Amino acid sequence: MSSTLREASKDTLQAKDKTYHYYSLPLAAKSLGDIARLPKSLKVLLENLLRWQDGESVTDEDIQALAGWLKNAHADREIAWRPARVLMQDFTGVPAVVDLAAMREAVKRLGGDTSKVNPLSPVDLVIDHSVTVDHFGDDDAFEENVRLEMERNHERYMFLKWGKQAFSRFSVVPPGTGICHQVNLEYLGKAVWSELQDGEWIAYPDSLVGTDSHTTMINGLGVLGWGVGGIEAEAAMLGQPVSMLIPDVVGFKLTGKLREGITATDLVLTVTQMLRKHGVVGKFVEFYGDGLDSLPLADRATIANMSPEYGATCGFFPIDAITLEYMRLSGRSDDLVELVETYAKAQGMWRNPGDEPVFTSTLELDMGDVEASLAGPKRPQDRVALGDVPKAFAASAELELNTAQRDRQPVDYTMNGQPYQLPDGAVVIAAITSCTNTSNPSVLMAAGLLAKKAVTLGLKRQPWVKASLAPGSKVVSDYLAQAKLTPYLDELGFNLVGYGCTTCIGNSGPLPEPIETAIKKGDLTVGAVLSGNRNFEGRIHPLVKTNWLASPPLVVAYALAGNMNINLATDPLGYDRKGDPVYLKDIWPSAQEIARAVELVSSDMFRKEYAEVFEGTEEWKSIQVESSDTYGWQSDSTYIRLSPFFDEMQAQPAPVKDIHGARILAMLGDSVTTDHISPAGSIKPDSPAGRYLQNHGVERKDFNSYGSRRGNHEVMMRGTFANIRIRNEMLPGVEGGMTRHLPGTEAMSIYDAAMLYQQEKTPLAVIAGKEYGSGSSRDWAAKGPRLLGIRVVIAESFERIHRSNLIGMGILPLEFPQGVTRKTLGLTGEEVIDIADLQNLRPGATIPVTLTRSDGSKETVPCRCRIDTATELTYYQNDGILHYVIRNMLN
């Protein structure tokens, strides 16, 4: 193959009388062979390799290997992918900017040029994670929540404004605008990017990585992208390619159409269940089939959004006529739309009817078989048919109590002077929230229409339900108002509370005090119903043990019913003014009614709301910062502190030390999420982080959340493994971030034990089951363990992003051999761990792990090194990816 394949494949195309240069896959195919049936998602990767071919980071062999994927629908090769841009939200963005600022300090200390610490590709940071539902249920809720958000986060927002002026190619979308993935879908995403290079306009596929796992939503627009940890995103924006293995691609064939009364939410919960069962971790999923001909882009985005929940790297929908239709609706220019169509067709990236690419494996779903569903009570893949929810709730409640005897009596309480009874199974939170569904006009209009019918019949929200509406963009408010549905949602308590993530990420705010007291008094198992994408235990609210994902209209329906024990398929939701029962079917809007309402959504709404997307409110504009290349760290700050990760860094890496005499800090079960490892929600006053804040003069009311404090490593290391629902098997029957300082028997916080081990210079290990690190792309779930002194995590399997994050922080991920677990080994957590010869580590190698039991007996377990690529090994040997990037800058 020609060493100048990149040059040989360069071609031009015309769009709107403008000439664009591009790297043509059909021209490349003359050397590579027929690539017509390569999955469209891999064609995006192939173009990327072709465009970046330099003979070093991208070679002929890399391009040949990706084109040769077709032979076996698999390829064992590491490639270097360079996304066009980076997307961030503020919870992950603040610590990323802290790292960049700290890197500038390190480069300065080591005699380098600080201006090299600058993004080389566009970075958009959307502030969406900080608004909390403190106020709800009235017309003032939005203004009050915004006021509190600005008050609590003033220092963080000052820091982000400093970053905006200090770093090039770095844009900030201010708070109160929308959710990053919805803003990306509706405005930032281009499908095809173009830029002026050496006097030529170059066209290439839009692509990105994001510091949030639901970055995958943009794949609904035909834009390849996925979530990575903040540390990997920082490296990407500084010019470091994303190291990855060429993925397997699972084809998901969609046929037929959804039946009357079935929503995109029901569809995505079904797809999630099927793909989780199939096993797609580390793989691409690509959707195909004639069912796509009638699947709106908003529905595709909903499915793509939940890729982390089904475990795939991404869920890709190729560009087609429906993509262009959505781009026009959302206010993209005619020039861009024509370029997207012309480019996609020229490159073989356009979806044609009957396309059957080659896939590693396939699944098929007739959308006519999808039924009304929820997912819960603790995992998004646990789909439950609507009529089976009471049984699923009862089963989970019994499991929680470890007994079949469940007879919890209602608890009397008084609110606003009125006496009530709070039943077991009460729905205490009903939230229309999350980009997953609020990006979808059909389910939002359905919720509004259902509310209208309910109000007309005289139905009311149950008094113990905290209801909220938090759309992912202001466009939602515009079209609900245009359809005259806002007053009905308001009447049922679904007033606007903010434009941001809110309940979906755990910012549900406090429940009314009488409700919290009643739950505790009766030890009630209560529920939250939300239109989000995650329902892990302890995530939505500390007192809410069961969480259910549902479509927006079902969220409204559960607010009316107020109880998870009611069967919405057969039982009445409530009673009308005459006392007659009202069933869900009586108020569920028809497909025709929904379609008429959706027709009111216009491109003018999108253009109006996104015209000043970077401007922000008067409060945002009033935040003043001084211009400087390096940040003026405040020693008394409890939000922003200079991170210690580069304190002892030298210009050359030291050899990797073997692990001798490591103690187990925690022994955990299956599906331990990054929420368990590094919670984002509220900080308990009696926790190590709570005590730290109080010792630094912060009152309880000003604690804010762990997520908002990610710019302060002192808070975050104390919050590591601090989820109130985590279960360390070293302390049976105990919930929360507790452990033993071995060889002692006393229970203490994981943080306190880790500090004692550090004083003794004892390295630490974590033992876990399957799917360790699932959930959010939370880099503090790797940074926190690093600061606690954890050197190795040994698990049955890892979720993709977290495994990468561990390596990025210099922590070794090891996998037990097939069929071997902590249980088959009979581990107690009292074992001492030794791992030798780490200087000669190889990707994927078998590593002998020696376990010394408390009786002195030894056992060696051959574990698999989950450092998968040579590039990852280089990062590990440099003590982390950012250390490697800094050393590159210095050299």
UniProtKB/Swiss-Prot annotation:
GO molecular function, one term: mRNA binding
Pathway involvement of the protein, from the record: Carbohydrate metabolism; tricarboxylic acid cycle; isocitrate from oxaloacetate: step 2/2; Organic acid metabolism; propanoate degradation
Signal peptide segment: none
Domain of life: Bacteria
Annotated GO CC locations: cytosol
Binding-site list for [4Fe-4S] cluster: C435, C501, C504
The entry's keywords: 4Fe-4S, Iron, Iron-sulfur, Lyase, Metal-binding, RNA-binding, Tricarboxylic acid cycle
One GO biological process term: tricarboxylic acid cycle
Pfam families for this protein: Aconitase (PF00330), Aconitase_C (PF00694)
InterPro entries referenced in this protein's UniProt entry, alphabetically: AcnA_IRP_Swivel (IPR044137), Acnase/IPM_dHydase_lsu_aba_1/3 (IPR015931), Acoase/IPM_deHydtase_lsu_aba (IPR001030), Aconitase/3IPM_dehydase_swvl (IPR015928), Aconitase/IRP2 (IPR006249), Aconitase_4Fe-4S_BS (IPR018136), Aconitase_4Fe-4S_dom (IPR036008), AconitaseA/IPMdHydase_ssu_swvl (IPR000573)
Reactions catalysed, as given in the entry: citrate = D-threo-isocitrate; (2S,3R)-3-hydroxybutane-1,2,3-tricarboxylate = 2-methyl-cis-aconitate + H2O
Requisite cofactors: [4Fe-4S] cluster
Effect of inactivating the gene: Cells lacking this gene show no phenotype during growth on propionate, acetate, succinate, glycerol and glucose. The acnAB double mutant does not grow on propionate even when supplemented with glutamate and is unable to respire propionate under anaerobic growth conditions.
Keyword Heme (UniProt): no
This enzyme's EC code(s): 4.2.1.3, 4.2.1.99
Enzyme class name: lyase
Cofactor note: Binds 1 [4Fe-4S] cluster per subunit.
Known role: Involved in the catabolism of short chain fatty acids (SCFA) via the tricarboxylic acid (TCA)(acetyl degradation route) and the 2-methylcitrate cycle I (propionate degradation route). Catalyzes the reversible isomerization of citrate to isocitrate via cis-aconitate. Also catalyzes the hydration of 2-methyl-cis-aconitate to yield (2R,3S)-2-methylisocitrate. The (2S,3S)-2-methylcitrate (2-MC) is a very poor substrate. The apo form of AcnA functions as a RNA-binding regulatory protein.
Subunit record text: Monomer.
Similarity remark: Belongs to the aconitase/IPM isomerase family.
Protein name according to UniProt: Aconitate hydratase A
Organism of this sequence: Salmonella typhimurium (strain LT2 / SGSC1412 / ATCC 700720)
Gene that produces this protein: acnA
